[in-house]
Amino acid sequence: MIAYKVLLYLYACLEEKISFDQRVYDKAIRKDQIGENYLINVYRMMQEKRLIEGAVFVKAWGNVLILASEEQDLRITVEGIEYLSEHGRMKAVGKYLLETMDMVAGLIRMVGLV
């Protein structure tokens, strides 16, 4: 679900429905409930799958992966948009989030995914 929330927020930014705001982004993806290393790995996997771009990763202290770029530098790609709009499981997640979370629901309605 984290990937969906990230893609949804970045899509709303791309469509200029919203401007990137770190506090709003953190709340939208519920960053306070996600481990930092886990989130970085999600970003890495999303970039490897070409769903997002703009993430810069550096290995520090051995094998610890850190995000060297700002989250506001992340951008959704064409593949990310297609993933949001065509992936059946993601639509189901969108419907679930629409029913349960106000902020994410507002973003879903704003970009017209459900």
Model-predicted segments: where are they?
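Short, solvent-exposed secondary-structure capping/transition elements
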Residues: 18-19, 55, 92-94
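Short alpha-helical segments that sit at the start of domains
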Residues: 1-13
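Generic structural signal for hydrophobic core residues of well-folded globular domains
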Residues: 10-14, 46, 84-87
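Short acidic DE-rich linear segments
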Residues: 107-114
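Short acidic, hydrophobic short linear motifs in intrinsically disordered regions
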Residues: 16-33
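Short amphipathic alpha-helical interaction segments
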Residues: 32-59, 70-71
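Short, amphipathic alpha-helical interaction segments positioned at domain boundaries
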Residues: 61-100
